UniProtKB/Swiss-Prot annotation:
E.C. number(s) listed in UniProt: 1.14.-.-
Entry superkingdom: Bacteria
Family that this chain belongs to: Belongs to the cytochrome P450 family.
Organism this protein belongs to: Mycobacterium tuberculosis (strain ATCC 25618 / H37Rv)
Gene of this entry: cyp143
Role played: Cytochrome P450 that accepts electrons from the iron-sulfur ferredoxin FdxE encoded by an adjacent gene.
Cofactor entry: heme b
Modified positions (N-acetylthreonine) in chain numbering: T2
Keywords: Acetylation, Heme, Iron, Metal-binding, Monooxygenase, Oxidoreductase
Name recorded for this polypeptide: Cytochrome P450 143
GO terms, molecular function: heme binding; iron ion binding; monooxygenase activity; oxidoreductase activity, acting on paired donors, with incorporation or reduction of molecular oxygen
InterPro entries: Cyt_P450 (IPR001128), Cyt_P450_B (IPR002397), Cyt_P450_CS (IPR017972), Cyt_P450_sf (IPR036396)
One Pfam family, short name: p450
Subunit and interaction comment: Interacts with the ferredoxin FdxE with high affinity (Kd=84 nM).
Positions bound to heme b: H91, R95, R284, H340, C342
Amino acid sequence: MTTPGEDHAGSFYLPRLEYSTLPMAVDRGVGWKTLRDAGPVVFMNGWYYLTRREDVLAALRNPKVFSSRKALQPPGNPLPVVPLAFDPPEHTRYRRILQPYFSPAALSKALPSLRRHTVAMIDAIAGRGECEAMADLANLFPFQLFLVLYGLPLEDRDRLIGWKDAVIAMSDRPHPTEADVAAARELLEYLTAMVAERRRNPGPDVLSQVQIGEDPLSEIEVLGLSHLLILAGLDTVTAAVGFSLLELARRPQLRAMLRDNPKQIRVFIEEIVRLEPSAPVAPRVTTEPVTVGGMTLPAGSPVRLCMAAVNRDGSDAMSTDELVMDGKVHRHWGFGGGPHRCLGSHLARLELTLLVGEWLNQIPDFELAPDYAPEIRFPSKSFALKNLPLRWS
């Protein structure tokens, strides 16, 4: 089969790269520049990567041609990936049902509870004088706050994280182990039981409310939603916690500025998400022939939209490789764009604002461990630091 763009002499040149060789692990700025410099469309590992701002944004806003369902709903999998793997109008219905629970107004009611958990988690670390911030905080923090909002027992946090880690590791292995399969089965059994229990005995939590509203989700839809949120819905905050603490450890003047002017924490958080989004690309599949970057992709072409490359493309003063702290919140695509823009973006901002503010309150001065060199796990579907050793007196 001929790859589009390479069918005959003199045709459009399609650059080919190997994803795992991109220099992403140490410096995403260099990694995304390598991809942008290769061309507007780059073929890697069976996917067409779109690297130009105008092409990426046009695709994000056009689900009719760039389908999420075809890219994200595994063939033959009876569990619907709600709401991610749906296109309008089905996706529109899911957003309408779910959006009220993740709106600023709804989250403001949960703020006192979320703040208490944030204070307690950092208080448990502050007296140690050191921590490995990814394992001790970043991986735990969004899960704990999610359980509070969603309505799952807090005592199940660690085993849910264990199941999640095993299932994600399984997806990266050519041959799953028996332990991987067992973890996937146990997670599904757990969620099935919790969904059924909340349907029988609903409470004020999100898991209950989406099953009893004016347009309730079916049991299989709620199960698919819960499965997605556990496996992939919390990565943005985990990654951003790590990158936030990394930058603060490096920059004592920035720490002092944010302590003196907490309103600027919001600007800082937006910059972290712009520079280091955990989900740097959005997968899509074309539903009809479409011309992008000078070449025509046929229907059924697997595409990845490089939002992280756009965020750093230098097209304006705010789209650089540097942390821009000018007092303003600037537009970026770290939370995606178009109808599939991150449903939990308001929650992520709230959680990160709470965490950075409370960390600086309890641990105002800290530093990186000697000889530490930050790297992300790469290649990986989600970008986050491998580890982050911090210390303070």
